Swiss-Prot record:
UniProt motif Cell attachment site: location: 6-8
PTM description: Acetylation by EP300, CREBBP, GCN5L2/GCN5 and PCAF regulates the transactivation activity of Tat.
Keyword Acetylation among UniProt keywords: yes
Organism encoding this protein: Human immunodeficiency virus type 1 group M subtype U (isolate Z3) (HIV-1)
Keyword Ubl conjugation annotated: yes
Subunit structure: Interacts with host CCNT1. Associates with the P-TEFb complex composed at least of Tat, P-TEFb (CDK9 and CCNT1), TAR RNA, RNA Pol II. Recruits the HATs CREBBP, TAF1/TFIID, EP300, PCAF and GCN5L2. Interacts with host KAT5/Tip60; this interaction targets the latter to degradation. Interacts with the host deacetylase SIRT1. Interacts with host capping enzyme RNGTT; this interaction stimulates RNGTT. Binds to host KDR, and to the host integrins ITGAV/ITGB3 and ITGA5/ITGB1. Interacts with host KPNB1/importin beta-1 without previous binding to KPNA1/importin alpha-1. Interacts with EIF2AK2.
Gene Ontology MF annotations: metal ion binding; RNA binding
Protein name: Protein Tat
One GO cellular component term noted in the UniProt record for this chain: extracellular region
């Protein structure tokens, strides 16, 4: 997974960023 697999880094980075943004907006709200 550290070799930047096709669809793996994009699928894991999208949900991870969305989760981090939601977590930062949740407590910030």
């Amino acid at each position: 997974p550290s070799s930047q697999p096709r669809g793996d880094p994009t699928g894991q980075e999208e949900p991870k960023k969305k989760v981090e943004k939601k977590t930062t907006t949740d407590p910030f709200d």
